């Protein structure tokens, strides 16, 4: 830690402060970043901010992104996925029952707000053969009140967030999840740039480990971290909102079953194939440099080291025998 000497870095969040980013607040509050030699700025996002651009341009060393990182990679933006927080993406469509929306196909002709960067929701429509141009697209206000007031019929949302206010308003609503169409994507992926990883591999490793340690703490102490968020980062919502968000996140993160941060090449392959199947990625898209899999690489390095040692001994034995 001392060798890193409190290096300043920025983590660009993908949205406003909330329990959605609890692990990073916990890592800061518990001193995990400090112990890793890092001084971390947690930068809140605003609507329309391109998180990938912030990271690739070097304005931020790290970011939180969607599965659209794969599409960014195809576009030539050299992003590297470091860890997955949500094993199941929280992105859904929420529709007013009063707007006569009974199935996903009823979105045709309805007033729909879809947020930027929600590629999997667009993929959901394509999978269901619903042309996006047949929706009455409305710019997203990011206010569930617009759905409550009937200004729109459908909104894209995080299943862990907006329903808090819809329930409080006693609104009858339906939730449509891409998982019903076989689109079971990751959510809120921690990432960096190839440039950052290439120049500062130890810093990347230290930041990742401290962040995931923070996430484990946050999921074990949700009340404490919800109170921290409300007191230090954002009082935009009542404390009960952050506690609600924490509860809703448990089945999406699955900390009881899966190590926080875990991601598999096979699952990313499935995501890439899903995008390819609907024309959002080319078939056979090579994303090998997109994944940061330190545990697997460590095992491969150990195997190679063992193989080299074995071969060296073998050669030495052959030389010895030949000299006899």
Regions found by a protein language model. Give the residues of each.
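Secondary-structure end/capping motifs
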Residues: 199-278
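N-terminal hydrophobic or amphipathic helices and topogenic motifs
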Residues: 1-41, 250-324
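Solvent-exposed, polar/charged alpha-helical surfaces in well-ordered, non-transmembrane soluble domains
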Residues: 22, 31, 53, 57, ...
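Beta->alpha turn/N-cap motifs
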Residues: 44-48, 58-70, 75, 85-86, ...
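Short beta-strand-to-loop elements that line the ligand-binding cleft
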Residues: 39-47, 61-62, 132-142, 175-178
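Bilobed "Venus flytrap"/periplasmic-binding protein-like clamshell domains
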Residues: 6-30, 89-169, 182-187, 269
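Pocket-lining segment of extracytoplasmic ligand-binding domains
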Residues: 68, 124, 140-235
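Alpha-to-beta junction loops
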Residues: 38-41, 55-65, 77-79, 110-113, ...
């Amino acid at each position: 830690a001392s060798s890193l000497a409190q290096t300043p870095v920025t983590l660009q969040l993908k949205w406003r402060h909330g329990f959605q980013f609890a692990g990073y607040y916990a890592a800061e509050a518990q001193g995990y970043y400090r112990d890793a030699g890092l001084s971390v700025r947690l930068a809140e996002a605003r609507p329309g901010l391109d998180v990938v651009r912030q990271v690739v341009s070097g304005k931020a060393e790290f970011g939180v992104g969607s599965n659209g990182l794969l599409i960014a990679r195809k576009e030539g933006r050299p992003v590297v996925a470091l860890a997955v927080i949500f094993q199941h993406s929280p992105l859904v469509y929420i529709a007013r029952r009063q707007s006569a929306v009974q199935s996903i196909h009823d979105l045709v002709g309805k007033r729909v707000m879809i947020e930027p960067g929600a590629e999997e929701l667009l993929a959901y429509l394509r999978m269901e053969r619903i042309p996006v141009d047949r929706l009455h697209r409305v710019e997203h206000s990011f206010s569930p009140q617009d759905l409550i007031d009937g200004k729109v019929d459908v909104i894209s949302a995080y299943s862990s967030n907006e329903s808090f206010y819809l329930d409080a308003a006693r609104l009858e609503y339906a939730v449509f999840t891409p998982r019903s169409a076989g689109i079971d994507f990751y959510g809120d992926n921690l990432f960096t740039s190839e440039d950052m990883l290439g120049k500062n591999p130890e810093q990347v490793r230290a930041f990742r480990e401290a962040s995931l340690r923070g996430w484990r703490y946050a999921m074990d102490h949700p009340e404490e971290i919800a109170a921290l968020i409300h007191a230090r980062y954002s009082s935009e919502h009542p404390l009960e909102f952050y506690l609600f968000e924490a509860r809703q996140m448990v089945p999406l993160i699955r900390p009881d079953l899966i190590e926080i941060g875990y991601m598999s090449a096979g699952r990313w392959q499935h995501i890439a194939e899903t995008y390819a199947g609907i024309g959002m990625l080319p078939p056979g898209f090579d994303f090998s440099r997109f994944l940061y899999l330190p545990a697997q690489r460590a095992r491969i390095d150990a195997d190679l080291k063992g193989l080299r040692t074995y071969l060296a001994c073998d050669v030495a034995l052959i030389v010895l025998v030949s000299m006899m």
